[in-house]
Amino acid sequence: MTAWIKLISESDATGTLRDMYEQAQTPHGTVDNVMKAHSLRPHTMQGHIALYRSVLHHPDITLPLWFLEVIASYTSIKNNCSYSLTHHFMNARRLLNDEERADNIYAALLEGCPERAFSGKELAFLIYAAKLTLDVGDMEKRDVDLLHEAGCSDGEILEVNQVTAYFNYSNRLLNGLGVTTEGDAVGYYKASGEETS
């Protein structure tokens, strides 16, 4: 079972849904279950695709993409969303292209101890993402002041804020509908040496 509600397959998609599936294709040429979860209301997929691509795949992003994938993964850990963690830590791992470092980061995040793998502004961003995820009602100006003190620019803060906010949305979509990775090609990026479709 890939979800607790009906998901319309790519082969059964017609009209607007078929068009949305074409827009949602990954570099693997597949449509992940996170997008298929919208299949009964394809208009909601359009907004999801636009938001996802704007926070993780836009050319004006300044922070390293591997690190934004780490933010996505840490947010997903805090929300206990195995779907997003599976996909997005695979992305971080492929972008890092350093298995030992990726393993160390993954262990530190799972243990809730990002300071074991990060320092400086990267650590400050992870602390911010965790608080925004778990204690959103307690956010205050001081949280942003701490990011400034760590050397983060306002634009970088916005990038991390948007990735964290997006994954809080996506994690709730996935966990709330019981969406699994069954049938997905895990990760957005091809593995080193893997041919693009």
Task: Walk through the language-model features, giving the residues of each.
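Hydrophobic alpha-helical segments
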Residues: M1-S197
